[in-house]
């Protein structure tokens, strides 16, 4: 069975798994349960049923990885981002692994061969999100002091390559203000560490940095080259970039 609805609550996820588990042919075990990204409720179910749980992340951050359930010996957690791997691997060294994202090379070879002569004519093409639709930071109502502090911090980070200073520089006061400004701030129970500073740094400021950097980079490139962007994001801040519709990758 395949679970496609991302909006299922943890309880609904477990109910679906339990129905599949109970409806299997008598005496036929599950080899393993697989998911894209990590779901604590699935890990709990697999641990109780003693079924291997295999997952592979495609996002960063995946805040559910802070759950104490990542420590179970029934988990086989593959993380695509090396910094993500370094952060979480010590919590379960024998069951958390580094595995970059992959693709079906043979399939793409066939796609390229069948589209001969139909390649875009732009000098530079990008496919993907600007993060404008994902950036929760844009909806925060912050004090002038905090807004100025964070603007300066983000400008400093944009000039630094190879290191991330955001989380280490955030003060408790700034973290509290971000948390208070969004009633949907992610604050899970049963975690192995306090997640507030990580969530503020990565789920709010990190997304804002990604949005800012992508828009600035595209605008700078468009001053010198023909640039096309295939996206479904809000592109009003782009200048001289040829905006195309989003593309289907699967």
Predicted regions and their residues:
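Extended catalytic core of nucleotide-activated donor transferases of GT-like folds
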Residues: 1-91, 106-113, 242-250
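Nucleotide-sugar donor-binding catalytic core of glycosyltransferases
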Residues: 94-95, 100-250
